[in-house]
């Protein structure tokens, strides 16, 4: 990979990273659009994957056990996802960069410190760190693409406010496929080598429209339909979202930038990411694929964790007060565990240390709301829970994950409607899964079709 131009500020930041050489090579050449950069990358990556498969296509990557098959395919090495890799000790890496590294090198808004999600999307899609001007260009492009077609506006405005926000969200995204460029191109017989270009266009349109859809749902469901639906082209993606939600608070806008960045991607095996990949492999357009992923995200085992943390915290506060002692906390935690429940927000299927997504939210809280009672309670719990979980001997990871903190921050800034939190998660997750979907089509990945077995057949196989 050739060296790209790098500003003095970026070089200074890069020198703080452990792999300076790799980072410098990742700086995008200023002046090029996202599509230009991606178009140059696609043939290079196609050739690299082609040669890699030619040389190592028969290499075995692991074995599958009966328990893996019955256990949600946990641990089976079966998917290729270019955008992120989850390290058990360091947490998620977006194209090789950890969250702290992303916070250092991705462009922030003027006067802000948190990375702009536009920069993260550029990184996920291209593997390169964009310049600030490129991120600003992307913000403007999304603003230009953001308008909703009238049939979707009408549908949203006629949905019952009692309908769950995620149901409204998935329905609206599905309806947006009326204008899918990929679906039209496929119907017109476009060559498969061009699929990625139309998936890219649909993905850009969809990401641009998501804040408008999500804000409309919020205002209709919780604000009696009041609120702005207008996009300000001078604002970034997150700032426009916050404005349309009806909030006018600079720290909350910074929180939203952080939230939308850190929830964007988490490898390809989680339910929402895998669903988008699976449905997209049938050449369903990005709207249908992402809507399917949203329906997976709506499941309580995937997207409701931060709500469960808040419910648990409220029960704790009701029983032990807002400022319980460590002994009171220990007593309540043991009570939770002995009743057969888990402590929500603690543990992770892959991570074996504190989730860096938790850590960056904690750092945000220490900066912006250090005196908040609920944050202080969360800090006490962070001190008390891990030793107790370790003592039980049943938990591989006793440390907090991203969900242990996010709900508390949203509550602090006035967003108390917990049923809406998964919509925020969905807006963020679009960045990762749609970047992956573009690469699925660029690399020509086929329809997904694993082999399944019945229990009777498995019994016969092991008896041989």
From Swiss-Prot:
PROSITE patterns: CITRATE_SYNTHASE (PS00480)
Keywords noted in UniProt: Behavior, Mitochondrion, Transferase, Transit peptide, Tricarboxylic acid cycle
Superkingdom field: Eukaryota
Transmembrane segments: none
Enzyme Commission (EC) number: 2.3.3.16
Molecular-function GO terms, alphabetical: citrate (Si)-synthase activity
Pathway: Carbohydrate metabolism; tricarboxylic acid cycle; isocitrate from oxaloacetate: step 1/2
Enzyme kind, highest EC tier: transferase
Active site (UniProt): 302, 348, 403
One record GO biological process: citrate metabolic process
Catalytic reaction(s) noted: oxaloacetate + acetyl-CoA + H2O = citrate + CoA + H(+)
Gene Ontology CC: one annotated term: mitochondrion
Tagged with keyword Cell division: no
Subcellular localization: Mitochondrion matrix
PANTHER family: CITRATE SYNTHASE (PTHR11739), CITRATE SYNTHASE, MITOCHONDRIAL (PTHR11739:SF8)
Alphabetized NCBIfam families for the sequence: cit_synth_euk, PRK09569.1
Known function: Plays a role in controlling neuronal activity and seizure susceptibility.
Other known facts: Citrate synthase is found in nearly all cells capable of oxidative metabolism. Mutation of Cs1 causes a behavioral mutation ('bang sensitivity' = temporarily paralysis in response to a physical jolt). Flies lacking Cs1 exhibit alterations in neuronal firing patterns in the giant fiber (GF) pathway.
Similarity remark: Belongs to the citrate synthase family.
Subunit structure: Homodimer.
Designated name of the protein: Probable citrate synthase, mitochondrial
Lineage: Eukaryota, Metazoa, Ecdysozoa, Arthropoda, Hexapoda
């Amino acid at each position: 990979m050739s060296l790209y131009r790098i500003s003095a500020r970026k070089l200074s930041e890069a020198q703080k990273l452990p792999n300076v050489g790799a980072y410098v090579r990742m700086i995008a050449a200023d002046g090029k659009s996202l599509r230009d950069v991606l178009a140059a990358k696609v043939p290079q990556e196609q050739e690299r994957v082609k040669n890699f498969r030619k040389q190592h296509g028969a290499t075995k990557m692991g074995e599958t056990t009966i328990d893996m098959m019955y256990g949600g395919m946990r641990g089976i090495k079966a998917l290729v996802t270019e955008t992120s890799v989850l390290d058990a000790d360091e947490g998620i890496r977006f194209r090789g960069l950890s969250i702290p590294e992303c916070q250092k090198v991705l462009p922030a808004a003027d006067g802000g410190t948190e990375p702009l999600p536009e920069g993260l999307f550029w990184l996920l899609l291209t593997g390169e760190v964009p310049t600030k001007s490129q991120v600003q260009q992307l913000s403007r492009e999304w603003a230009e693409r953001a308008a909703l077609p009238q049939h979707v506006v009408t549908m949203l405005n006629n949905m019952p406010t009692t309908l769950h926000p995620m149901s409204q969200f998935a329905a609206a995204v599905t309806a947006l496929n009326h204008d899918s460029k990929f679906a039209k191109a496929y119907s017109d017989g476009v060559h498969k080598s061009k699929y990625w270009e139309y998936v890219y266009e649909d993905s850009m349109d969809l990401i641009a429209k998501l804040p408008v859809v999500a804000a409309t749902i919020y205002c209709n469901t919780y604000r009696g339909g009041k609120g702005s639906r207008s996009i300000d082209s001078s604002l970034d993606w997150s700032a426009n979202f916050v404005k349309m939600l009806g909030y006018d608070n600079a720290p909350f806008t910074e929180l939203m930038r952080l939230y939308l960045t850190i929830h964007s991607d988490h490898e390809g095996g989680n339910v929402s990411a895998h669903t988008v990949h699976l449905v997209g492999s049938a050449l369903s357009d990005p709207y249908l694929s992402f809507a399917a992923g949203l329906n997976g995200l709506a499941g309580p085992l995937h997207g409701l964790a931060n709500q469960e943390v808040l419910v648990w915290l409220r029960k704790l506060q009701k029983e032990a007060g807002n400022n319980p002692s460590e002994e009171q906390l220990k007593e309540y935690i043991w009570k939770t565990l002995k009743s057969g429940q888990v402590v929500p927000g603690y543990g992770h299927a892959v991570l074996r240390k504190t989730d860096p997504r938790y850590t960056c939210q904690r750092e945000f809280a220490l900066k912006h709301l250090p005196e908040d009672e609920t944050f202080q309670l969360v800090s006490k719990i962070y001190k008390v829970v891990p030793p107790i979980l370790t003592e039980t001997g049943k938990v591989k990871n006793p440390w907090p994950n991203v969900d242990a903190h996010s709900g508390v921050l949203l509550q602090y800034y006035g967003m108390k409607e917990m049923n809406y939190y998964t919509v925020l998660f969905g807006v963020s997750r679009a960045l990762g899964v749609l970047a992956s979907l573009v690469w699925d089509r660029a690399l020509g990945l086929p329809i997904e079709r694993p082999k399944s077995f019945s229990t009777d057949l498995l019994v016969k196989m092991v008896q041989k």
